[in-house]
Amino acid sequence: MYKVSILIPVYNVEKYLSKCLESILIQTYKNIEIIIINDGTTDSSLDIAELYASNYDFIHVYSYENAGISTTRNRALEKATGDYYLFVDSDDFVNPHMIEKMINEAIRTHSEIVTCGYHIEYKGLSIPVSPMRKKNMDSLSALRALSQNKGINNYPWGKLYAASCFKDVKFPDEKKGFEDTYTVFKAICNAKRVSIIPNCYYHYVKRPGSLTDHMDLVQAYEMRAAYEYQELCLHQLFPKENFYYDINFYNSDMVILYTLIFFYSRKEQPVYVPAVIDWSKINIFYRIGYIVWRFIACVKFGWSLKWQEN
């Protein structure tokens, strides 16, 4: 039976950690280890983690000074001893059958990565986000699906990875946002086959203090830079292949406009640099949404919004 390492970064999640760990402890697949990396938490999260570790010998807790999410995930990777890895954020939780279903799919299809759907948990609502249909593909097809946002996303969670996918792959410590985007596609590059299953086994908890609650333009433009980095690397790896990143650039522009509208004032004189997008690749309803958001930005900022062509 293959061993699965569940990698959990912890920082000030005392309200959520027990639910996260309990959801893992009731997994129907039992050959697991839980690696908890305490990133200098200042609340009772460490006490909670150590209490669980004292009761279960497969839970291991390691504490460090605060270094950020990338370093914390890299430390978890260094401690992992499993054949497969599963990232779970400490404020999220998972369905009881998640690991069993995903590892069975990995074995059945000889896939190094299996990704599933998820629920967004927000203010009492549970909103499913599903890839819609099951699919198995080679690495190149998976990278194309990632570039077009079709069934594969840039989140490290919600995916079961063979340990080999993270050979010479680390999360970038120097990035201050969207570090996952620099990493997940590298893991996919190391996979021979990738499977998508539509079941929503992961529960992403959107809570106060999340990135979208205090976004700034540096972070928003970092999102686009991450997609540009992906696109450049993929064109270098596969010069004869077409990777259409227009939908991702569209999404990054919508995040930038959202940030401008909700977090900036006229006196700050923010700069908006539109992405270069082939609009023929974008759904008409998305195009309308973009026009509306640009109009709102213009109304809010007037001539104080600095427009700069990319």
Protein language model regions, located:
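A conserved acidic beta->alpha catalytic loop
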Residues: 23, 38-47
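Glycine-rich, basic loop-to-helix element that forms the pyrophosphate-binding segment
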Residues: 64-80
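Conserved nucleotide-sugar donor-binding catalytic segment
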Residues: 142-217
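Short aromatic/hydrophobic "clamp" motif used to bind/position activated sugar donors
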Residues: 85
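Catalytic core of nucleotide-sugar-dependent glycosyltransferases
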Residues: 201-207, 213-241, 257-279
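Conserved donor NDP-sugar-binding/catalytic core segment of glycosyltransferases
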Residues: 97-129
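N-proximal low-complexity "stem/linker" segments adjacent to membrane-targeting elements
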Residues: 1-26
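Membrane-interface aromatic/basic loop that binds lipid-linked glycans or pyrophosphate carriers
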Residues: 262-310
